[in-house]
Amino acid sequence: MIWVAVVITMLLFILVAKPTGIYLEKAFQGSKKLDKVFGPFEKLIFKITGVKEYNQTWKQYALSLVLLNGFMIVVVYFIFRLQGVLPLNPAHIEGMEPTLAFNTAISFMTDTNLQHYSGENGLSYLSQLIGITFLMFAAPATTLALVMAFIRGLAGKELGNFFVDFTRALTRVFLPIAFVTALVFVALGVPQTLDGAVTAQTIDGVKQSIVRGPVASFVSIKELGNNGGGFFGTNSTHPFENPGQMSNILQMMLMMLLPTALPFTYGRMVGNKKQGRILFVSLFMVFLLGFITITTSELNGNPALNAMGIEHVQGSTEGKEVRFGTVFSSLYATVTTAAETGAVNTMHDTLTPIGGLVPLVNMMLNTVYGGVGAGFVNIIMYAIIAVFISGLMVGRTPEFLGKKIEGKEMKLIAVTILFHPLLILGFSALALSTSLGTDAISNLGFHGLTQVVYEYTSSAVNNGSGFEGLGDATTFWNITTGLVMFLGRYFSLVTMLAVAASLKEKTVVPETVGTFRTDNGLFGGIFIGTIVIVGALTFFPMLVLGPIAEFLTLK
């Protein structure tokens, strides 16, 4: 039965992707029906905020994005610092320490949701609602807006206006879907209240304080926006965030909903639906490979414990919730790192070496399918690299969507693709070279190295999950991961928007017999190969020194 449930879940991922992709295209391309429903409210927002609906250049678009996000970071930072004297604080939680507030504000504005605090004990209700939940809407709306401008540029159209796209992302996508799914989560047993903790008496006669709060509304946007941060410190392992298998499947569907829809949106917007389907299928094959790998590893159990004769029929159950089991815990770990969400229903630090390698590789690739918007930008970056390499091999000028890929575009892409490895490996080396970093490691040897690299990888690609054996609630880790999150988020968004703007100005080259097609199985294979060769091999030495070496040691 468990495998039937897995297949049904996978089919649900596939079935909802195309309709959602069609809806996104209509939401941002001026559907008359949607304009009638949402238009009056949006125009009121534009009037109050003074937004004028005009087409921006790529520099204006990028500057608007960065400035608005920067302003939000500052506002939320002060909410965290002052929460002790602000209302909606029934637990009387004190203001955050400066570096932790810095880290947390950047974490949620960049859609990372890395948490160096425990949710129920570190934030007041005001901070959870006005600070965290607000950014959980604003962060994915930012990148969904940007990816629409990015696709318009690839299609040779005007980029649009950031503030208009940002507003539409909120009013037409995130608010309505999050509202409906929050009600579903309430029906499934997730609490939604502004009352404080309650005191219960256990069967042993001991009094226990049970924390609750506006959890359902938090969880819906947490998953839909690929945010991933937990209302509670234990995230989606907590029964109030994820009561059972139905809520577990719904959370995975929400995580995959927008990332899997964007290839179809892209295909419709650029006038090549088949290319969108090829991208979707190619990435789903990589996703399946990751799921099969992690599930096989976890079901085989820990080799060291197996050698001691310990029963392992259920696989490696360390760090997993019994109500989800090994298979669905493995699927959740694959989904949350493929969609760059970072929510967890099992502790990733307790995964087997190869089991832990899959989430790490998913994040390093940042394309399968990646987070809302930002992941799809990376997908197209790899697609352009695949076209460029193919063109060089046959001696033709590379073309993508009928436009020549030349030096300017490839220089921007080269800088972008090198930036993330430099961030991840550079800061990992810094942490390993000082006691400020190594003192946080709870496991010596290969696993300790993986803990450090996982933390910076998760920060750079805005995932937010962690190997939580790492003691990262220190000034060093707060500042360094904060910088990595900020740079990892905005650098690639700006450079790839510049690539789209450059292609927008180019004329379409007529298709000939010798044109390399990007909407067939051959391109899909080359695309996957490019991701593996360029993406995975960049980090291969680290993977050998970390999870692979740990696996061989246990064997």
Curated annotation (Swiss-Prot):
InterPro entries attached here?
Answer: KdpA (IPR004623)
Q: How does it sit in the membrane?
A: Multi-pass membrane protein
Q: Please tell me where this protein is predominantly located.
A: membrane
Looking at the UniProt entry, the stretches that span the membrane are 2-22, 60-80, 130-150, 173-193, 246-266, 278-298, 374-394, 412-432, 483-503, 525-545
Single GO MF annotation? potassium ion binding
Which domain of life does the protein's organism represent? Answer: Bacteria
Keyword annotations of the record: Cell membrane, Ion transport, Membrane, Potassium, Potassium transport, Transmembrane, Transmembrane helix, Transport
NCBIfam families tied to this protein = kdpA
| Role noted for this protein | Part of the high-affinity ATP-driven potassium transport (or Kdp) system, which catalyzes the hydrolysis of ATP coupled with the electrogenic transport of potassium into the cytoplasm. This subunit binds the extracellular potassium ions and delivers the ions to the membrane domain of KdpB through an intramembrane tunnel.
Subunit and partners: The system is composed of three essential subunits: KdpA, KdpB and KdpC.
**Name the UniProt record assigns to this protein:** Potassium-transporting ATPase potassium-binding subunit
- Which species? Bacillus cereus (strain AH820)
The protein's gene is named kdpA
